[in-house]
Structure formats: C-alpha cells, structure tokens
Swiss-Prot record:
Residues 2-184 form the tr-type G domain. Its EC number is 3.6.5.n1. NCBIfam families: lepA, small_GTP. It is a peripheral membrane protein. Required for accurate and efficient protein synthesis under certain stress conditions. May act as a fidelity factor of the translation reaction, by catalyzing a one-codon backward translocation of tRNAs on improperly translocated ribosomes. Back-translocation proceeds from a post-translocation (POST) complex to a pre-translocation (PRE) complex, thus giving elongation factor G a second chance to translocate the tRNAs correctly. Binds to ribosomes in a GTP-dependent manner. This is Elongation factor 4. The gene is lepA. It catalyses: GTP + H2O = GDP + phosphate + H(+). PANTHER family: TRANSLATION FACTOR GUF1 HOMOLOG, CHLOROPLASTIC, TRANSLATION FACTOR GUF1-RELATED. The lineage of its organism: Bacteria, Pseudomonadati, Pseudomonadota, Betaproteobacteria, Neisseriales. Keywords: Cell inner membrane, Cell membrane, GTP-binding, Hydrolase, Membrane, Nucleotide-binding, Protein biosynthesis.
Length: 597
C-alpha cells in the first residue's frame, strides 16, 4: 500500500491537464501507440470539441521511479468547470494529492482557485506544476509569485514541464512519488468505498468508479449502498489503465471500477458509500450531498410527435448524468415538453447539444430560470421554477430569490468595468483583495441575473481576462414581479419572465420591440404587448402586409376607390378574428439576449 499514489489534476479550462494526463499514460505504457488518441480520458465527443472534461475518468499506471521501486499511480481526472464543482469535490476526496497545473503564460484563474481551495479544505496535498513553459510568452517567475499571492501555497521551485512536447513529464511523475502521501486505511476493517463517479454501459448496466478507503472488496461479495439502502452483488471488479483490466479484489487505498446488477444510476449516487452486507461499516464516509438543480428550462420538440422520442432521449442521458432532472409540462404556446433542471448554464448547453447531436432532436428551449421561494398570505411556502406557475399577485406575501456568492478574478485595469457590471446586476460587494496584478472581487449576486447573460458580459467587459466561480448562498426576499408578453391579446406562457420591479418597464419595452422585429408580418396587424398583471406597460404593432387594391384604378371616381379600400378593411378584420400567430424559435431565443443595456 505504501507504493500507491492517488492524485488528481486541478486546472483551468485549456491549461493542459488532459494533455498532461495523456503524457502520463504514454510514459507509463498504459496504452500502446496505436491506441493513443489525443485526450484519451475525455471520451465524449463534446468533451473533446469544447476541450473540457465533464465526467471523472481514471487511469491506474505503473511507474518505475528513479529509486528503482514500482509505484501504482491512480490518476483521477476531474472536471474543471464551475457547473461541475460537486463532481470535482468527489474526485478530490478520493485522492491524497492533487497536481495544480497552471499555464505558465496565463497565470492563475478563478476556477483553479476555487478547486484548489476545495482541495485544501479536504486536506489534500497540493503540488504546483507549471505547464506550457515552451511557449514564448511563458513567465514562470511571475506565475510562481501569483500562485503564492493568490492561493497561498509555496510555489518556489515548482516543477516546470510542457505536456505537449513532453519536456519535464518525468520530473512531474517523480514529484508525485516524492510529495504526495501514500493512502491511509485498514485492509481488515469493515469495507468503506466511496463512489467517485458512475455511468451507464449498454452491456453491463451501471459502472461505478470507486475508491476503497477501508477494507477489501472481492468478486461475488454482497454489498449495500448506504444512502439508498439498495443491496446487490459484485459482478466484476477491476482497474482502468485507461483500458479496463479485470481483478479479483480491490484493497484499501486502491481506485477501480465496480459492476453490480444495478441498472439505474439513481441507486449508485456519486459520493455514496458502499459497504458489505455481511460486515457493514458503522457509518458512511462524510461529504455526500444530493445534487440540487440550480437552473431550469423548458425543452420542447419542434414536431409534437417527437415527444416520446424526447422522453427516451432524456431518460438515456439521465443514465449517464444523475444531476439532470426532468418532468413533463404542457405549454399553450409550445405544446407538450419537459421542464428540466440543470447544475448551471454550461450543463444546460451540453445537454441541449447532446440531445441534438446524439439523438437527432429538433428542440425549442425556453429562457432559463431559477427557483424562487414564494410565501403565500396563508403562510404556506412553495417553490416556483416556472414563471407561468407563479400564483396570483394578490395571494403572495413575499417572493424570495436565490443569491449566489461570486468570486471574480480580474486584472487591475478592468476592475472598474466589472464592478459596474455587478452593480447593474443588483450585486452587493462583499470583499475586494489586491493580489499582485490581479484583483479578487467577491460579490453577492441574484442568481436570476447571472443565468441570463452575466458570464458573456463579464468576458466582454474584461476582454476575456476575468474568470468567475460561484456557489449558492441563500434565499433573500426581493421585490419581484411577473412580466407577461401578449401577442394579439393572448398571453404566451413560454415567454413569461420574473423580473425585478425596477427593471420591469425597461425590460418590457425592450422585449416588445424585439418581438416586433422577429414575428413575421401577417395579413393583419398584430399587437405585441408587455403586461404586469392587468397593466400594459409597453406595446408595439407588427404592421400588416397589404395588397395595393387601388393599382387597377386609373383616375376615376373617389367612391370607387373608397369601396375597394373598405372591402379590404373588412376582409382584414375578419382575418384578424380567426388568424393565429406562429411565434418562431428565434423569438424565444431573443428573450435570452435582451440585456439590461
């Protein structure tokens, strides 16, 4: 056991952790050359394309160190994006050490800081590594100083390497052996193994990635999951070298995969503890949480007969992604569809893209919303995540909205812009800290403002230099109202929004004028109105297309022309009573882009 090293890699998107992982696998001979593809651990197409890691993957590598001993290095790959922070904390809790990979030309970013603090809180040994030192813009001294200023760990003499060209990779492996402690644990104690990740395989059902903390797990053992109380039998055990290799048993300190008869991902929750039925552990390992959805959106098929296909597709995605929640919902404007819950905006985009790409679905997505707590006058408390489900204004005592704490790292020259942006979004400044050339701002922001377009705005106002990390803080009472959009006097439920009273009129006007541009002209006038309750706050008209009925009259009597115009007017009036207006998909998307300029 003293020769096992469990570690993960913490890095910001694009700082090169997947490439570094590839180099480790190549160096330790985990795969032969024909099986090496770039970014071996990122197995989803969308992961490779966006260059991000979504699910945790592992590789068990045998490394012969310079001292002549063979060490088993278990690399647990972690996602770097803020939406997947729970997965990161689970991956880290399975390790004793973490490599902090920082791009030597770019320096430290906010997500790196957040994940690094998570690691330090979990008591994980953090080893700094500077990557991309072969770039002409690399400045190792400055970045070492930044790591010390911002994160507060000793970075003098941090290992320098370039994962792309392979320089210094061996030094990094030596550093892992030297700095990261061997796992602690007792092979003879009752079994406690934490589920680091789980995914669905078409042939064997659910595959769980586990880290054995105490005890030993063998083939054909009967096991129990401690949070769901489900019981099952071990069918297969083994390790990934990224290929799967079967084993008879896994002992304390090891990381490997476990396949049982479980068919549903909901039974094997990430962070849960597995123990033996015959000799159970007295308590589960700490740190397990149920994942809460933060952002909600409606997904509707463009063709209503695709509804069942969409349900199947969502169920299949849920097999691999336990944090995706969905329930059926009906909208008058869009027909049958689903209300889905996501971890954040990136998660929403990824799910939408996977549905379109892997399942060939044509989707309409409504504006993302967050959960509000509504206290009614009779003292009852309800949760509302769909604006059209908000009860009547008369029956509401208060509405509470979710507040997040955002940590923003930004170069000094853009601080003013970022602060202005946060104030526009009703943010409250909590802290401001100068660290070298960077400034760390902490703000409490309403989540509602963040899901709209905060991230894009933050990037554009800081020329892409600012980086953001956030976590949920609490619900706070706020002066919120529901804004309805009416087309031809009928409410379009899918376009309702919950907004702050101050910005309601402004938003209403912007939306109405945007809708006017996007709704195709019909044969009759269409009124687009924004309303709060029964009060109309903005109106725009989509002008009718009309035929020039006077084209055939040359000269002649005015009454003849009047007669033709009256006839046309009557026809338009009749049309308006029966005509219904198709609202194009672009109009729904426009709602997202209407910003508080």
């Amino acid at each position: 056991m003293k020769n096992i090293r469990n570690f993960s890699i913490i890095a910001h998107i694009d700082h090169g952790k997947s490439t570094l992982a590839d180099r480790f696998i190549q160096y330790c001979g985990g795969l032969d050359l024909r099986e090496m593809s770039t970014q071996v651990l990122d197995s989803m197409d969308i992961e490779k394309e966006r260059g991000i890691t979504i699910k945790a993957q592992t590789a068990a590598l045998n490394y012969k160190a310079r001292d002549g001993q063979v060490y088993q290095l278990n690399l647990i790959d972690t996602p770097g994006h803020v939406d997947f922070s729970y997965e990161v904390s689970r991956s880290l809790s399975a390790c004793e050490g973490a490599l902090l990979v920082v791009d030597a030309s770019q320096g430290v970013e906010a997500q790196t800081v957040a994940n690094c603090y998570t690691a330090i809180d979990l008591g994980v040994e953090v080893v700094p590594v500077l990557n991309k030192i072969d770039l002409p813009a690399a400045d190792p001294e400055r970045v070492e100083q930044e790591i010390e200023d911002i994160i507060g760990i000793d970075a003098v003499g941090a290992v320098q390497c370039s994962a792309k060209s392979g320089i210094g990779v061996e030094d990094v492996l030596e550093e892992i052996v030297a700095k990261i402690p061997a796992p602690a644990g007792d092979e003879n104690a009752p079994l406690q193994a934490v589920i680091v990740d789980s995914w669905f395989d078409n042939y064997v059902g659910v595959v769980m990635l586990i880290r054995v903390k105490n005890g030993t797990i063998k083939l054909k053992d009967k096991v129990r999951f401690m949070s769901t109380k489900a019981e099952t039998q071990v069918e297969q055990l083994g390790v990934f070298t990224p290929k799967s290799v079967q084993k008879q048993e896994l002992k304390a300190g090891e990381v490997g995969f476990l396949i049982t008869g479980v068919k549903e991902l909901g039974q094997a929750k990430v962070g849960d503890t597995v123990t033996l039925i015959a000799n159970p552990a007295s308590e589960p390992l700490p740190g397990f949480q149920e994942v809460q959805s933060q952002v909600f959106a409606g997904l509707y098929p463009v063709e209503s007969h695709d509804y069942e296909a969409l349900r199947d597709a969502l169920e299949k995605l849920q097999l691999n992604d336990a944090s995706l929640k969905f329930e059926p919902e009906v909208s008058q404007a869009l027909g049958f569809g689903f209300r889905c819950g996501f971890l954040g905006l990136l998660h929403l985009e990824i799910v939408q893209e996977r549905l379109e790409r892997e399942f060939d679905m044509d989707l309409i997505t409504t504006a993302p919303t967050v959960v509000y707590e509504v206290v009614l006058k009779n003292g009852e408390k309800i949760e509302v995540e769909n604006p059209s489900k908000l009860p009547d204004i008369g029956s509401i005592e208060t509405i509470l909205e979710p507040i997040i704490t955002a940590t923003i790292l930004v170069p000094q020259e853009y601080v003013g812009n970022v602060m202005t942006l946060c104030n526009q979004k009703r943010g409250v400044q909590v802290n401001m800290q100068y660290m070298g050339r960077q400034v760390m701002l902490t703000y409490d922001l309403p989540m509602n403002e963040v899901v709209m377009d905060f991230f894009d705005k933050l990037k554009s106002t800081s020329r892409g230099y600012a980086s953001l990390d956030y976590h949920f803080k609490e619900f706070q009472p706020s002066d919120l109202i529901k804004l309805d959009i009416m087309v031809n006097g009928e409410k379009v439920d899918a376009l309702s929004l919950i907004v702050h009273r101050q910005s309601a009129v402004h938003r209403g006007r912007e939306l109405a004028s945007k809708m006017r541009e996007l709704i195709p002209r019909q044969m009759f006038d269409i009124a687009v109105q924004a309303a709060i309750g029964s009060q109309i706050i903005a109106r725009e008209n989509v002008k009718a297309l009309r035929k020039n009925v006077l084209a055939k009259c040359y000269g002649g009597d005015i009454t003849r022309k009047k007669k033709l115009l009256e006839k046309q007017k009557a026809g338009k009036r009749r049309m308006k009573q029966v005509g219904n207006v198709e609202i194009p998909q672009s109009a729904f998307l426009a709602i997202l882009q209407v910003s508080d300029k």
